[in-house]
């Protein structure tokens, strides 16, 4: 079977408009992109915000980096063990942690969060997303949406690496430091692979100086001030 060429793929517009979807949910969708080092508090803040939004009657969903890597962006072993993919397919479609795979990881979730937000949900994405160009690409995906630009709110979880290492809930920093000391690189963000901090995030929160409640209030106030959420 011949490969389908890009010129043979066309966008198919439905009859339901985005305004109609958003009116049904009584809210305008948006993506809130939480980025920061491992252990910085991204998921903690995103989950807490999701709970508050739900309690206030808003539809929201957290897309967590670890959770997504157990399915959509799983690595070859997980795909073979839990999805019964053949080894060749698993290696072809599975994602590891090379710079190229990290780029594809963020590209995929950028597309998924765009779909969620386009449907009217608040998509709360919690990913290290260490490379600035990948985050910029995710923003561009939202800005160039076929049915009109979708709000993309970047939230920099600016917790110092010292605090992240003290927490180290998964023991990854120690593992990475030990690997580097032994002359073996792990490509772990913040240790032997760079984290490129956002230059102009919409919001910034530091878990070493602010509580989760303060972080939630910071984001919630931003959403209220800009009309995404009622006061």
Predicted regions and their residues:
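Extreme N-terminal, non-catalytic leader segments
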Residues: 1-31
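Hydrophobic anchor at the beta1->P-loop junction of P-loop NTPases
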Residues: 34
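The conserved Walker
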Residues: 38
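Conserved lysine of the Walker
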Residues: 42
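Conserved substrate/cofactor phosphate-moiety recognition/catalytic segment
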Residues: 47-114, 118
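Conserved catalytic network of the ASCE P-loop NTPase/AAA+ motor domain
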Residues: 114-121, 141-150, 195-198
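Conserved phosphate-donor/acceptor-positioning beta-strand/loop module used by diverse small-molecule
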Residues: 125-126, 130, 145-167, 205
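Small-molecule kinase domains that catalyze NTP-dependent phosphoryl transfer to phosphate-bearing small molecules
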Residues: 158-161, 166-218, 226-231
